Amino acid sequence: MTPLMVLVLGPTASGKTSLGIALAQQLDCRVLSIDSRQLYAGMDIGTAKPTRDEQQQARHELLNLSTPDQPINLQQFCSHAQTLIEQEQQRGRPALLVGGSGLYLQALSQGLQPPALPPQTGLRQQLQQLGQSCCHQLLSQADPQAAAKIEPNDPVRTQRALEVLYGTGQTISSQQGRCPPACRVLELGLNPSDLKERIEQRTASLYARGLVAETETLSRRYGADLPLLQTIGYGEALAVLAGRLSESEAQALTSRRTWLFAKRQRTWFRNRHQPLWLNTESALEEALEAIAAARS
């Protein structure tokens, strides 16, 4: 039987976590979480990381791999993930990848091979001192192709692209080869019509569960200038702590930023993947039917 990789993809707040757990229970496999922020310990509420109860319902992997001040690059992540994918397939189980981080999903499902350059701590410190705006401008001049794919407010990926450029003398775009995986890939997509309402509900839940307190803990431990604390949710919570926003204003801004991000995610998935889009009301049944057909 040809090994099978199942991707459950979709924008944030689309219901991927619940579907992933249900599929893992039905298929007797693990959930491999493909989320670029859930990799970090202590970033639980703001990333909507599966709760302790959800992790007891199905075993989750690729969570809490590092601390927020020790970034994991794409090559390191793929190495961790590939080991787990091979373990699942060797046991005769589908590798179940669940997440919304498009580049990570693309790398694993389409064989994108990122440069194997270890993090350059000294260079990263220099880049952080320059500031994100300056770094993205530098990248735009040196590697326009990479800059076009990276959001101007994404310091982690911007710094990594510059790190590869200065560390190897070649652009990251020129080093991203492809080696398609030796397995069948089934892509299942979620894109509910009420996504905006779901985002607003989830954002309210994050703040009610203690997003501001979690952000305060992280900023005390790692510093308020930590790049990951500038991302959606944490950036607004920092503004609350600094007195620049009320919590209600921060919640509204987080919802807006999340909605814009979700729209970009949907565009990415439509352009780079060809998923079977599932009906939200019957997603589990449709997913199981598609998986059974792919395994036959």
From Swiss-Prot:
What the entry lists under Pfam families is as follows: IPPT (PF01715)
The UniProt record gives the binding positions of ATP as 10-17
Positions with a binding annotation for substrate: 12-17
The record's listing under InterPro entries reads:
Dimethylallyltransferase, IPT, P-loop_NTPase
Question: Which residue ranges are recorded for the region named Interaction with substrate tRNA?
Answer: 35-38
* Keywords recorded for this protein, A-Z: ATP-binding, Magnesium, Nucleotide-binding, Transferase, tRNA processing
Q: Which domain of life is it from?
A: Bacteria
Which parts of the sequence are marked as the site Interaction with substrate tRNA?
101
**Keyword tRNA processing, does the record have it?**
yes
Has keyword Nucleotide-binding?
Answer: yes
The UniProt GO MF terms for this protein read: ATP binding; tRNA dimethylallyltransferase activity
Enzyme class, spelled out: transferase
Q: Report the protein name in the record.
A: tRNA dimethylallyltransferase
> Which organism's genome codes for this protein?
Synechococcus sp. (strain RCC307)
Its gene?
miaA
